[in-house]
């Protein structure tokens, strides 16, 4: 390696598009790479949410025109090879122009052509899969990638290039105090159990409609914090209207400080997206996961099993959420010692150093 090559900062192109589940972990890694002196650029789609999320992040964006083909109509599928080829050439042009040294793909439509472009140019590729079941793009790229990162064990067949890193999470989540300390403090203060229900930014209608009737049947003192989405506040409040006196209820459109919410919760009831499961484990909170039934390849159930299989969480499929089933489940869980044990197990299986682990792997390529 020449002196000029040694003095040139490593240029890493990030590839992530479409959803926050892809973009947020990639952004955490990108910011850490920048802090270590790397030059970072981002391969994006023209209309994806990544453009909005990266607006003030001081990361230059380069767009290629690509859309998903899985499950779409015949005409789009026939046109797909030509669109992929065009997008691949566009990505190759950017990579040569920018003198990219390494490429890191985190999923989304953009990662396919980008990974292929890097492969054709001889640029090393790292991919990161956030879910317990690999997405279509990452499953294909795993064949040509130099390093394959998985958030959950056994997502990919065992290989020297496969590394279980966990999912990168925000610093405020990794800084939450230990679950044993938090739960013991609340027990010593003889506080009611805190139940946190998180339906996401749009609100999970099934959680909003089915949980209040079941929770109202419980006889123990509870503080319920129910995040239901902006459009479902009034309807959710109405379902709690005749709640008994042992329940203290707050219905919220959204929660700005999730780290605080995690730290104060004894039990969380939520979907099982990859980042949600990762944050629950990192925070150390007992959980009931209700996987999204329409998730591709039922990956949310696979995500939830990561914690359920070690006794840190329960899985309740949406199709089984009857008042009787929920009442039986919640009655079992209204035990602070059990919840403490679940929370401790969750934290024990977290990987809070995932961001730095992925960064180190990129730096070594």
Swiss-Prot record:
The keyword Cytoplasm does not apply. Pfam families: Glyco_tran_28_C, Glyco_transf_28. UDP-N-acetyl-alpha-D-glucosamine binds at residues 19-21, 131, 170, 201, 255, 274-279, 300. It is a peripheral membrane protein. It catalyses: di-trans,octa-cis-undecaprenyl diphospho-N-acetyl-alpha-D-muramoyl-L-alanyl-D-glutamyl-meso-2,6-diaminopimeloyl-D-alanyl-D-alanine + UDP-N-acetyl-alpha-D-glucosamine = di-trans,octa-cis-undecaprenyl diphospho-[N-acetyl-alpha-D-glucosaminyl-(1->4)]-N-acetyl-alpha-D-muramoyl-L-alanyl-D-glutamyl-meso-2,6-diaminopimeloyl-D-alanyl-D-alanine + UDP + H(+). Its main location: membrane. Pathway: Cell wall biogenesis; peptidoglycan biosynthesis. Transmembrane segments: none annotated. GO terms for biological process: carbohydrate metabolic process; cell division; cell wall organization; lipid glycosylation; peptidoglycan biosynthetic process; regulation of cell shape. One of its GO terms (molecular function) is UDP-N-acetyl-D-glucosamine:N-acetylmuramoyl-L-alanyl-D-glutamyl-meso-2,6-diaminopimelyl-D-alanyl-D-alanine-diphosphoundecaprenol 4-beta-N-acetylglucosaminlytransferase activity. Gene3D superfamilies: Glycogen Phosphorylase B. GO terms for cellular component: plasma membrane. Keywords: Cell cycle, Cell division, Cell inner membrane, Cell membrane, Cell shape, Cell wall biogenesis/degradation, Glycosyltransferase, Membrane, Peptidoglycan synthesis, Transferase. Belongs to the glycosyltransferase 28 family. MurG subfamily. Cell wall formation. Catalyzes the transfer of a GlcNAc subunit on undecaprenyl-pyrophosphoryl-MurNAc-pentapeptide (lipid intermediate I) to form undecaprenyl-pyrophosphoryl-MurNAc-(pentapeptide)GlcNAc (lipid intermediate II). This is UDP-N-acetylglucosamine--N-acetylmuramyl-(pentapeptide) pyrophosphoryl-undecaprenol N-acetylglucosamine transferase. It comes from Acinetobacter baumannii (strain ATCC 17978 / DSM 105126 / CIP 53.77 / LMG 1025 / NCDC KC755 / 5377).
């Amino acid at each position: 390696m020449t002196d000029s090559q040694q003095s040139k900062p490593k240029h890493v192109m990030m590839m992530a598009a479409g959803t926050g589940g892809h973009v947020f972990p990639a952004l955490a890694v990108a910011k850490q790479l920048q802090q270590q002196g790397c030059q970072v650029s981002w391969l994006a789609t023209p209309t994806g949410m990544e453009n909005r999320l990266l607006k003030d992040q001081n990361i230059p964006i380069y767009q290629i025109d690509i859309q998903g083909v899985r499950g779409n109509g015949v005409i789009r599928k026939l046109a797909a090879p030509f669109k992929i080829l065009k997008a691949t050439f566009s990505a190759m042009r950017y990579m040569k122009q920018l003198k990219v040294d390494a490429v890191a793909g985190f999923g989304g439509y953009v990662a396919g052509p980008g990974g292929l472009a890097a492969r054709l140019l001889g640029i090393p590729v790292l991919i990161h899969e956030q879910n317990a079941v690999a997405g279509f793009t990452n499953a294909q790229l795993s064949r040509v990638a130099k390093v394959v990162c998985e958030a959950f064990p056994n997502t990919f067949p065992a290989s020297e290039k496969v590394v279980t890193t966990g999912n990168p999470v925000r610093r405020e989540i990794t800084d939450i105090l230990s679950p044993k300390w938090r739960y013991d403090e609340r027990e010593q203060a003889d506080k009611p159990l805190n139940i946190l229900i998180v339906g996401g930014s749009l609100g999970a209608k099934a959680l909003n409609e089915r949980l209040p009737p079941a929770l109202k049947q419980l006889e123990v003192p509870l503080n319920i914090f129910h995040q239901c989405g902006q459009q479902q506040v009034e309807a959710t409040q109405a379902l709690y209207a005749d709640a008994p006196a042992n329940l203290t209820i707050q219905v919220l459109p959204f929660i700005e400080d999730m780290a605080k919410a995690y730290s104060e919760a004894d039990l969380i009831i939520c979907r099982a997206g990859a980042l949600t499961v990762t944050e629950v484990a990192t925070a150390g909170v007992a959980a009931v996961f209700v996987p999204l039934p329409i998730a591709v390849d039922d990956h949310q159930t696979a995500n939830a099993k990561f914690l359920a299989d070690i006794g840190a969480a329960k899985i309740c499929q949406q199709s089984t959420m009857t008042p009787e089933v929920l009442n039986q489940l919640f009655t079992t869980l209204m035990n602070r010692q059990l919840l403490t044990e679940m929370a401790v197990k969750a934290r024990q299986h977290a990987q809070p150093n995932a961001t730095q682990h992925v960064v180190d792997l990129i730096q070594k390529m």
